[in-house]
Regions:
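Carbohydrate-active catalytic/glycan-binding domains of CAZyme proteins
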Residues: 1-157
Length: 157
């Protein structure tokens, strides 16, 4: 799951798998839902690995896709990272495309965070182990275009 804390102090929780992403509000105790979880509408080829962040007043939902029919076969290039944008933390979402190509791992999960004015994309690959099921943590700089779209992340090995 992913927990996102909005600027107004409201917490949201997201989870997903099997092609469905859901999100909902959390109560102040951070232990209970404040209402029902709802399906996040507008995502394209969602698989798993939901992450939410906010940039210039817009909400960004990033996730791993399932574009390969043999997605769990251990072949390089099984999952790309997509993102969608919304005016609300619970959507509806507008799919914007892919911001990261597949790694050499059988899957990819990512997060996007700002640190000291620079945005970063965290993800994993198999560069250290050379086995697609053993994940190595990676981080690269992430950049936005003037219109708020995310540039493709250049993966450095």
């Amino acid at each position: 799951p992913c927990v996102f804390m909005d600027d107004d102090g409201q917490a949201y929780i997201y989870n997903g798998g099997g092609g469905i992403c859901k999100g909902g509000k959390l109560k102040d105790n951070m232990m209970e839902l404040d209402g029902e979880m709802k399906v996040m509408e507008g995502l394209v080829d969602f698989h798993e690995a939901t992450w939410i962040h906010k940039y210039k007043g817009k909400y960004y939902l990033s996730y791993s896709d399932n574009h390969n029919d043999d997605w769990n076969d251990g072949v390089e290039g099984d999952n790309r990272m997509h993102y969608a944008i919304s005016d609300s933390p619970l959507g509806p979402w507008k799919h914007m495309g892919v911001y990261m190509d597949p790694t050499d791992s059988a899957t990819n999960h990512g997060s996007i965070v700002e640190y000291k004015g620079q945005w970063y994309a965290f993800y994993h690959n198999s560069a250290l182990s050379h086995h697609d099921w053993l994940r190595s943590i990676c981080v690269d700089k992430l950049y936005y275009n003037e219109d708020g779209t995310i540039r493709m992340v250049e993966q450095r090995k």
